[in-house]
Amino acid sequence: MDCPIPQTELDEIYAFATDLARKAGQLLLERVNDRNSEQVYAEKENAVDLVTQTDEDVESLIKTAIQTKYPAHKFLGEESYAKGQSREYLIDEQPTWCVDPLDGTVNFTHAFPMFCVSIGFIVNHYPVIGVIYAPMLNQLFSSCLNRGAWLNEMQQLPLIRKPSIPPLPATAPSKCIFACEWGKDRRDIPDGTLQRKIESFVNMAAERGSRGGKGGMVHGVRSLGSATMDLAYTAMGSVDIWWEGGCWEWDVAAGIAILLEAGGLVTAANPPEDIEGPIEPVKLGSRLYLAIRPAGPSETETGRETQERTVREVWRRVRQLDYERPTRQS
């Protein structure tokens, strides 16, 4: 990707973003540790779509810092965006910060450690910087274009890289860890989103060759309760496959930046008409994502070929999901 911002300036923005993520994470940690009073939260769309005062306070901290340091940059945050209720894709060619102040709010309200702050920096629709900080785990995932992806700024991602990054299994999705989320749409209706997801989960988990040939027999199915953390763990190499629909750009911008810089692949969750055709990179605002961990070569394939083979095998087993963006409001 040719970035119009010089590398030296990108490096400065990256250092600022990592420092800001740590400060925001410290505020999250202070709030989650304050368990003397009951957590106060409001429901957005339903009982599993929550927002706390902490979400808004952390976003305010991040937004103020960014607008002070980089007043010419655009800012898109989950909570300020949600209040507008436009649901339009607002990212353009301009340098844009895309922020989720607290991804995994349900986890946060239960003091389950899989929650984080997510800060992405986007230029020409491409995430060039990503920082994810999970304060209860003290895990900082970060990347800058052309600088690699890192855990706690010391260990390069993916973590397993000696003697080389392992290829994906020849029988993938068998022998893989598959991550997915239940999502906010819990309507129990025939062929609804929940039913399609469950069918896809079972297809991936069932013994090989079962379910009309769709059984994938993955090693395990994981649901971390945070799409951002799913992506971070895919970049780390701990998750092999992440499949999801319903996310917004602030959920994935930082994670996609980190995964791509680590050598991963991100494409659309829904299979195209011709699954043997070229695999296109995902559109940031598509709301449908399939991510594959970084992979090295096998004796017969390049790392990219093992990733693309895995993508096609997932597509053969999952249902189409419908998460179109709402129409423009007048």
From Swiss-Prot:
Cross-referenced InterPro entries: IMPase, Inositol_monoP_metal-BS, Inositol_monophosphatase-like, Inositol_monophosphatase_CS
Which residues pair up as cystines? Answer: none
Q: Name one GO biological process term.
A: phosphatidylinositol phosphate biosynthetic process
Asked if the record carries the keyword Ion transport, the reply is no
Pfam families reported in the protein's UniProt record: Inositol_P (PF00459)
What residues bind Mg(2+) 2, as annotated? D100, D103, D251
**Keyword line:** Magnesium, Metal-binding, Quinate metabolism
Residues that bind Mg(2+) 1: E78, D100, L102
Positions of substrate binding: E78, L102, D103, G104, T105, D251
Can you name this protein? Protein qutG
Q: What is the lineage of its organism?
A: Eukaryota, Fungi, Dikarya, Ascomycota, Pezizomycotina
